[in-house]
Amino acid sequence: MSKTRVYELAQQMGIDNKELMAKLAAVGVEVKNHMAAIDDADIKKLSAPATVKEVSQEEVRVKPTLIRRRAKVVEAVAEEPPVEPKAEPAPAEVTTEKVAEKARVEEAPAPEAPVQAAEPVKIATEEAVPERATANKAKILGRVEIPGLTQRAKPPVQREAQPTARVVERPEARPSAERPAPGQRPEGQRPGQRPEGGYRPAGPRPAGQRPEGPRPGYTERPVTRGPERPGQARGPERPAPVVPLEMPPAGEDRRKGRKGKEVAGAGKKGPAGAAVPKRKEEFKKTELFEKHERVFEPGPRGKGKKRQAEKIQIGKKTEITVPKAIKRIIKISETITVGELAKRMGIKANDLIRALMKMGVMATINHALDFDTATILATDFGYEIENVALDIDEILESTPDTPESLVKRPPVVTIMGHVDHGKTSLLDAIRQTNVIAGEAGGITQHIGAYDVTLNGRKITFLDTPGHEAFTAMRARGAKVTDIVILVVAADDGVMPQTREAVNHSKAAGVPIIVAVNKIDKPEAKPERVKQELMELGLVSEEWGGETIFVDVSAKKRVNLPTLLEMVLLQADVLELKANEDKAARGTIVEAKLDKGRGPVATVLVQEGTLKVGDYFVAGIHFGRVRAMQNDRAEKVLSAGPSMPVEVIGFTGVPDAGDVFVALADEKQAKEIASLRQQKVRETELAKHSKLSLEQLYEKIQMGEVKDLNTIVKGDVQGSVEAVSESLRKLSTDAIRLNVIHASVGAITETDVNLATASNAIILGFNVRPEVKAQALAEKEGVDIRLYNIIYDAVDDIKKAMEGLLEPTLREKFLGRAEVRETFSVPKHGTVAGSYVLDGKMIRNSQVRLLRDNVVVFEGKMGSLRRFKDDVKEVASGYECGISIENYNDIKVGDIIESFEMEKVATKL
């Protein structure tokens, strides 16, 4: 059996929830609130009385209509008007009897209906008494059900039913009798007897409790329900007395009666022609009445109706639309977050996360998706992804030069080689300056760019570090150079970094000139160097190859002019040219943060001319050239191709190796830098957030991985990069080293606060902490390590990482004794009289009992005695008494080994 909610039924009936609950209580159905569910049986109980009322109302006019239908319409109309005036004085008792008689007559077959034509007049007269109207409603209804036409006559009877009170109990309602009635409804019997105009004047009279104007019109609606209205002329059937009887005494009762009729009428099944017009007209009148009531009777009921109307509108089913094809294309840059993609597709982020998990990717709403992943996801949901990322490199691509615009430029020479083979000493000798004096430990820590003039021709030199940590810097040096001078010590030969330099140069397609240094030493063997380099593909010209070899001594300044002549000769062969009349373009050789000047970068101009005041972009930073100076700290206003200059005016410290491009205006430079910054952020986010289910499972299986966080500060960007990369290489499966921050400049309070929050160590490379930062570090217990040689930094970090590892336990052998006799001692158990064979027996040490070289027991020594005296240890060659804790099964001939477990620090 289906159940219906109270509020749903109220909406169907067009009444308020409270009114419906009151009606349910009246028929004996108890409900707690508007959300309660009621059965169909209870709904039938509720609808029964409403049906009866309508039948009783229709009953009164059945007879007149029948007369009309039998072509005696005029007579019926003529009889009613004189009878109605008598309705008011008629006594109530007579009304009851006559009503009963009418019911009996109605039970007769339909053909006898014309005989009953006179009775309607009597009924109308008697019903004019409103005093007993309410009590007799039900009884009259029962009688009316029998004839088919009675349902049409309901409106008049309802007027009588409300005054009459007690006759209702006699007849029983017969639903079967009501069925035939609908068949006769469409004959247009009601229209003539239910004139709407007649009710208007009677409106003010019956208003009892509510004298408002809208009430007469309101009562009119139930009467108009029947389809009889259009059938007859309204003039003759306007009985003034009938109208007042129809109006309920109270406004609330009228409302209930009207709505009950509406619901009942909606449920009746009659000919289509009769039902449709009735509903249309009634709906329009209801709207008019509600509008009137909202204006003149504002109150909870009016509000309730308004709410109902709103609910009906809200409940309308919305049409699901599909975006146009052009709207199903989502434009993204390199990456997009899950939340942003879901927002653009108009779906929930959880759906995307679920789809990603099916693909084996653990993701959150802030997870960054690359273009390919986003494309796969969007395709599953019917969308397309379009990559609209600007190709900045294409925008900044340099325009080709015409042969006429090219002029000769100085060669850029990079000096490379193994650590401590004399690269900087050679450059120092060439420049005749003491560059090496300032380098800690004799190791070049950053790239230097220098301009040297020889015989009126300029040569630009780049000095690169030889330490293994500076591989990236050597690779960059090889890319921007024209010629490489490979320095090899004659007394040391080819070393690992020598091979690396050769590989970098070959990869860049740069010609190599080999400078065999330190030939002034007695142990120098230049021929061995040539032989070793030949294995790397560098064959000397003397041996039929193409590689130039020059034996030099930087210390004694031997053959330096010859080396420079070879450089110029190689440059002439290469025919190095560049266009000076265009926007400058170059490479960042080195960058640092100067306390007085801000970010400063060494720029090697490769084409065009850089002038003071030019706007530029380099990596993720932009700026304007405020000032320039050469390697000798002299201010310059412009710099042409192959000229290294220090540029002041950056917004931040660029990375070594970034491309430097001069632009027309600041707006363009700022826009490009912003796009690059956004791209870097998205890439970093994607890098850190990628974690598949398999990787997650592996991490869980491996257990806890210990982290060592570090903050690296250096004097120049190249050194910071080198140190950071060296530290990252120290990570192992057991311990992971994270460089959480790396920048140039002194150690500040911000760095200390970051180290405090992340439990990190601060490494300073050629920098010192500020006074406040030092005090804060001591207060917070932050470890600050300062270095000027990269070897020391790497070694200390290794030690720190080893300290994080769990120490390993190692067994240390102490001594061995042979059991020669056993004794049973109270409170000590069995004591073994033993002879120490080697080592020494130490009290409270760990012991192992061996029998036939098989371990029988392992535990702790209970006591150690010598001649009844407790001793700390017994050396080899002496006798002693030994007891073992919680073990007494000691036999002659057993061997007792003494040992201890010591913790040993784990090495990486």
Swiss-Prot record:
GTP binds at residues 417-424, 463-467, 517-520. Residues 463-466 are annotated as: G3. It is found in: Cytoplasm. The lineage of its organism: Bacteria, Pseudomonadati, Thermodesulfobacteriota, Desulfuromonadia, Geobacterales. GO terms for molecular function: GTP binding; GTPase activity; translation initiation factor activity. This is Translation initiation factor IF-2. GO terms for cellular component: cytosol. One of the essential components for the initiation of protein synthesis. Protects formylmethionyl-tRNA from spontaneous hydrolysis and promotes its binding to the 30S ribosomal subunits. Also involved in the hydrolysis of GTP during the formation of the 70S ribosomal complex. It comes from Geotalea daltonii (strain DSM 22248 / JCM 15807 / FRC-32). Residues 442-446 are annotated as: G2. InterPro entries: EF-G-like_DII (IPR053905), EFTu-like_2 (IPR004161), IF2_II (IPR044145), IF2_N (IPR006847), P-loop_NTPase (IPR027417), Small_GTP-bd (IPR005225), T_Tr_GTP-bd_dom (IPR000795), TF_IF2_bacterial-like (IPR000178). Residues 417-424 are annotated as: G1. Residues 194-217, 263-276 have a biased composition (Low complexity). Residues 408-577 form the tr-type G domain. Residues 517-520 are annotated as: G4. Residues 167-177, 278-296 have a biased composition (Basic and acidic residues). Keywords: Cytoplasm, GTP-binding, Initiation factor, Nucleotide-binding, Protein biosynthesis. Residues 145-312 are annotated as: Disordered. PROSITE patterns: G_TR_2, IF2. NCBIfam families: IF-2, small_GTP. PANTHER family: TR-TYPE G DOMAIN-CONTAINING PROTEIN, TRANSLATION INITIATION FACTOR IF-2-RELATED. Gene3D superfamilies: 1.10.10.2480, P-loop containing nucleotide triphosphate hydrolases, Translation factors, Translation initiation factor IF- 2, domain 3.
